[in-house]
UniProtKB/Swiss-Prot annotation:
TM region(s), chain numbering: none
Organism: Nitrosospira multiformis (strain ATCC 25196 / NCIMB 11849 / C 71)
Gene encoding the protein: pcm2
Entry's EC annotation: 2.1.1.77
Keyword Transcription regulation: no
UniProt cross-references to HAMAP family, sorted A to Z: PIMT
Protein name as annotated: Protein-L-isoaspartate O-methyltransferase 2
Alphabetized GO MF terms: protein-L-isoaspartate (D-aspartate) O-methyltransferase activity
PROSITE patterns documented for this protein: PCMT
Taxonomic path: Bacteria, Pseudomonadati, Pseudomonadota, Betaproteobacteria, Nitrosomonadales
Any GO BP annotation: protein modification process
C-alpha cells in the first residue's frame, strides 16, 4: 500500500475534491506519505484521514495538506516560506517541492529530530529546521513570501504578521473548539483576511516542550 500507484490514486481523489494546482498535485505524488506516519499505520498512509504521530500531535489528512498548499502557492512558486509546526514533516516536504526555501519551526524536539532524518532520506535539502516557540516566528529569516500554520490559534500572533512580506500570504486555522481555515494577504495598505472552510487542528501551544 505504499506504491507509486497508491499515491496516484490519492492524487486522483484530490482532483475530485477540488485540488487543481499542478505543482501541488506533483508534490503530493512525489512525496511518500507513508515515510511520515508511524509504521503500524503505514497501511492507512494514503487514506484521507489524519493520523496520530505521538506527543498528542497528528499528521493532517492529504486533502488538508494539499488544500493549504494550494492556497499558499496561489498559482506561483513562493521564494521563502515559514512553516509553524513541523510535526511529522510531511507538510514541510510538500512545501519544499515548490518553494525556494522552507523554514520550519517546531516546539517538540523529538519530532524535529525525526523530521530531519526523513528529509535527509528523501534528499530534500532546501529546508531549515529550528527548535523554538512557533508563536514568535523566525525574525532572523524574515520577511517570508508565505507563512503556514499547522496548528490552530484564536488570534494571529503579531510577530507572524510582521514577518509576512508585502504581497505575501499566510494560511492558518483560526479558532479553538470551532475552527475555520483563513488566508491573510499583506499589501502596501495593510492586511486582508478571507475566511474559508471549517477545519479541525490541534491547538497552537506557546513555549518549548519540556520532557
Amino acid at each position: 500500500m505504499t506504491s507509486q500507484r497508491t499515491r496516484a490514486r490519492m492524487v486522483e481523489r484530490l482532483c475530485t475534491q477540488g485540488v487543481t494546482d499542478e505543482a501541488v498535485l506533483t508534490a503530493m505524488i512525489t512525496v511518500p506519505r507513508h515515510i511520515f506516519v508511524e509504521e503500524v499505520l503505514a497501511s492507512r498512509a494514503y487514506d484521507d484521514v489524519a493520523l496520530p504521530i505521538n506527543f498528542e500531535q497528528t499528521i493532517s489528512n492529504p486533502f488538508t495538506v494539499a488544500r493549504m498548499s494550494q492556497l499558499l502557492r496561489a498559482g506561483s512558486n513562493p521564494g521563502k516560506v515559514l512553516e509553524i509546526g513541523t510535526g511529522s514533516g510531511y507538510q514541510t516536504a510538500i512545501l519544499a517541492q515548490f518553494s525556494r526555501e522552507v523554514y520550519s519551526v517546531e516546539r517538540i524536539g523529538p519530532l524535529l529530530t525525526r523530521t530531519r532524518g526523513r528529509l535527509r532520506e528523501l534528499r530534500i535539502n532546501n529546508v531549515r529546521l529550528k527548535h523554538a516557540d512557533g508563536l514568535l516566528g523566525l525574525s532572523e529569516a524574515a520577511p517570508f513570501d508565505g507563512i503556514i500554520l499547522t496548528a490552530a490559534t484564536p488570534h494571529m500572533p503579531p510577530a507572524l504578521l510582521e514577518q509576512l512580506a508585502i504581497r505575501g500570504r499566510m494560511v492558518f486555522p483560526r479558532g479553538t473548539s470551532e475552527q475555520v481555515l483563513c488566508v491573510i494577504e499583506r499589501n502596501l495598505q495593510g492586511y486582508t483576511e478571507t475566511i474559508l472552510d471549517e477545519v479541525k487542528f490541534v491547538p497552537m501551544i506557546p513555549g518549548i516542550w519540556q520532557r
